[in-house]
């Protein structure tokens, strides 16, 4: 059609003022517009999917990259489970939701693409036409003194979006090659620019691991992409 579709994160909970950092549950919300510049109209009656008790997405079912593949839309959404008992650790992964109607409900795969132990969230996909390989960029969550933070951008690759292998991954950005932000590397988003792949990400100068006062970083990978040997 001629409408732009947006899936965005919503939550009824935040940290106290003034920061108001979103907190669980993370939900997938829907809006649409006739132009990417807006105005955007929220669609509260459209519920793509929600966290479900007893599943790998019982705490988080938040939006991710959407791609049309073999006649249906796949959304690579962020999923998580939080332990019931202290210290109430959080386990994160990526799941696939499917639909043929972007304004309708989605069905969620019974298992994530990789185990919860991977501790990843957020997605951005790139398809390398040279060898028909899909690359999924995501961020890894680490814990320091009980505080969680995104410490690296990882990439997974596959030739079939329905089949993933957790061993087929590599570190793209972390403290070893991102010197301006020695601790925080999060929310990678990729875009082809000429013969390079641009990677936008957020970071924070200094030794803090705060959610606030972050900057946007830019890195590049040469194209075509090739899995490391």
Role assignments for model-derived ranges:
Residues 1-229:
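Carbohydrate-active catalytic/glycan-binding domains of CAZyme proteins
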């Amino acid at each position: 059609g001629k409408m732009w579709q947006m899936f965005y994160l919503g939550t009824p909970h935040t940290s106290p003022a003034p920061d108001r950092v979103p907190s669980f549950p993370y939900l997938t919300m829907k809006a649409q517009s006739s132009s990417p510049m807006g105005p955007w109209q929220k669609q509260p009656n459209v519920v793509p999917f929600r966290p479900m008790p007893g599943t790998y997405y019982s705490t988080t079912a938040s939006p991710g990259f959407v791609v049309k593949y073999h006649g249906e839309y796949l959304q690579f959404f962020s999923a998580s489970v939080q332990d019931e008992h202290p210290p109430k650790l959080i386990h994160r992964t990526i799941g696939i939701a499917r639909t043929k109607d972007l304004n309708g409900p989605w069905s969620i795969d019974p298992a994530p693409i990789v185990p919860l132990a991977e501790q990843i969230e957020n997605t951005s996909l790139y398809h390398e036409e040279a060898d028909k390989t899909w690359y999924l960029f995501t961020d890894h969550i680490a814990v320091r003194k009980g505080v969680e933070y995104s410490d690296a951008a990882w990439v997974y690759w596959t030739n079939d979006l329905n089949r993933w292998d957790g061993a087929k991954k590599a570190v793209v950005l972390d403290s070893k090659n991102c010197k301006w932000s020695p601790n925080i590397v999060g929310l990678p988003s990729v875009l082809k620019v000429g013969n390079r792949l641009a990677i936008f990400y957020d970071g924070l100068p200094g030794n803090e691991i705060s959610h606030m006062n972050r900057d946007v970083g830019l890195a590049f990978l040469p194209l075509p992409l090739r899995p490391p040997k």
